């Protein structure tokens, strides 16, 4: 009986030693058999893929909560047949994606604001230039009007002076014309009184009186 026990014990010891030896030899071999990258590092696990249903449920949860508690993470993992680590990684990636989206929206809004400010500035500059051009045209028109009125007033003054010299004392000119006409008329009357015999005395007296007044 003792021999049997000793034999059994020795077999167990030998088996244990052989197992350890085999494990020590196999471990490096298994490490060598693992796929490695060109730089010698072991290849990482493939990216986790999520089904359409899982992605939809995770998006719904992320819409309400960007951060999950441990309890809620475990519940979602059981409901979607995922591990807790997968849920945690998905939410981390989703938060990073949200930050990038917000940053992109902010940059777009900033660019739109700058473009709008530039357009407003260009519009204001064009309005100012148009106003200045209009004011300069108006000022030039006023200057031309003033110069034209001055020239007109100067020419009119000279013309009025010359016209005044020609038309000075119209009563005197009329009297001179009347003297000339009546003088010749008086000569004719004085020389030909016999021809005026047919006229009445009153008319002759009026004519003679007018002639005498003119000569005087």
UniProtKB/Swiss-Prot annotation:
Biased composition annotated in UniProt, kind: Basic and acidic residues: 112-126
Keywords on record: Developmental protein, DNA-binding, Homeobox, Nucleus
Gene3D superfamilies assigned to the protein according to its UniProt record, in alphabetical order: Homeodomain-like
Record region (Disordered): 112-167
UniProt record, GO biological process: anterior/posterior pattern specification; negative regulation of transcription by RNA polymerase II; regulation of DNA-templated transcription
DNA-binding region: 43-102
InterPro entries, per database record: Abdominal-A, Antp_homeobox, HD, HD_metazoa, Homeobox_CS, Homeodomain-like_sf
A GO MF label: DNA-binding transcription factor activity, RNA polymerase II-specific
Entry's Gene Ontology cellular component terms: nucleus
SMART domains, A to Z: HOX
Biased composition (Low complexity): 128-152
Family: Belongs to the Antp homeobox family.
Name this protein carries in UniProt: Homeobox protein abdominal-A homolog
């Amino acid at each position: 009986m003792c021999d049997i026990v000793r034999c059994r014990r020795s077999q167990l010891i030998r088996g244990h030693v052989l197992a350890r030896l085999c494990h020590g030899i196999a471990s490096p071999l298994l490490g060598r058999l693992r796929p490695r990258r060109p730089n010698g590092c072991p290849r990482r696990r493939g990216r986790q893929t999520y089904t359409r249903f899982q992605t939809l449920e995770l998006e719904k949860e992320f819409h309400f909560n960007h951060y999950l508690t441990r309890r809620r993470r475990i519940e979602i993992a059981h409901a979607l047949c995922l591990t807790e680590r997968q849920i945690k990684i998905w939410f981390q990636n989703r938060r990073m994606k949200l930050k990038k989206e917000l940053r992109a929206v902010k940059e777009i809004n900033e660019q739109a604001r700058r473009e709008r400010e530039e357009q407003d500035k260009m519009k204001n500059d064009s309005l100012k230039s148009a106003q200045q051009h209009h004011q300069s045209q108006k000022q030039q028109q006023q200057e031309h009007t003033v110069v034209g009125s001055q020239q007109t007033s100067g020419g009119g003054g000279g013309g009025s002076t010359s016209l005044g010299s020609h038309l000075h004392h119209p009563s005197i000119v009329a009297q001179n014309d009347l003297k000339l006409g009546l003088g010749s008329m008086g000569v004719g009357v004085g020389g030909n009184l016999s021809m005026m015999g047919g006229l009445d005395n009153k008319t002759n007296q009026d004519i003679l009186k007018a002639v005498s007044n003119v000569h005087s």
